[in-house]
């Protein structure tokens, strides 16, 4: 049985999810709720298999490596902390937005 990681969601990522929900709710409250549920399901799945996801470009120490997982038109950026067996969700952005330079 694979090791399960705990998940933490940064205040920035929570704010991102709230903004996404508010923006989509303007045109379709039902779609907004469904989208947020899908994003949270994708985040929850990171507890079992966080490593296969694409690595954000850039030279970083392994502990600073940022990975990304696309879901619908959005991208979830996260970091894996092997020492604490934790997946840290950093931010959630629309795929058309420029990738963050800093996390």
Question: What kind of feature is each model-predicted range?
Answer:
Residues 71-75, 79-103:
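Enriched for short, Lys/Arg-rich terminal
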Residues 1-66, 100-102:
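Basic, Lys/Arg-enriched alpha-helical interface segments
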């Amino acid at each position: 049985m694979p090791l399960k990681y705990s998940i933490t969601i940064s205040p920035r990522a929570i704010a991102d999810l709230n903004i996404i929900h508010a923006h989509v709710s303007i045109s379709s409250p039902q779609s907004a709720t469904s989208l947020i549920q899908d994003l949270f399901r994708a985040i929850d799945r990171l507890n079992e298999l966080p490593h296969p996801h694409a690595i954000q470009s850039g030279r970083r120490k392994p502990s600073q490596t940022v990975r990304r997982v696309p879901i619908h038109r959005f991208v979830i950026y996260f970091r894996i902390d092997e020492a604490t067996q934790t997946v840290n969700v950093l931010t959630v952005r629309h795929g058309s937005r420029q990738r963050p330079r800093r996390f």
